[in-house]
């Protein structure tokens, strides 16, 4: 692990001696982040009557189309679950789009949020913000982390008590090979 600041790299040996508790602090950070995310997810799952139900069939259709719109152009979908008041979405950004331009996470999220907000607001005959400004994104670092992220995403409707098997939830998608999770 190294740190980059203003295009200057701090040598690993110096980083370790200057901050001997770095690994401990890193583990505390990840532990607190995990607890925060769990508490946030629990709050979302407990809200049974959201002002806009994303899992209504028409809203789910809008979201499914949007989540697949950039497939093969800017991203590869691995899994998603459309819950009544939030979405879990695991995807891999491509380095470049079909025109050879770099692909940025914020551009994909903004595009999906803008389009789905417009369409769902129209369907629900409402105005205003549909999505929170903040999204909780996580960088997946290896295959094990990817496996657990997909499993967590697919099983979210089960954990929320909405179905007994994730395959029974209409707003859930799992990539090929996800059937046994």
Feature locations, PLM:
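Short catalytic/metal-binding and nucleic-acid-binding patches
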Residues: 1-181
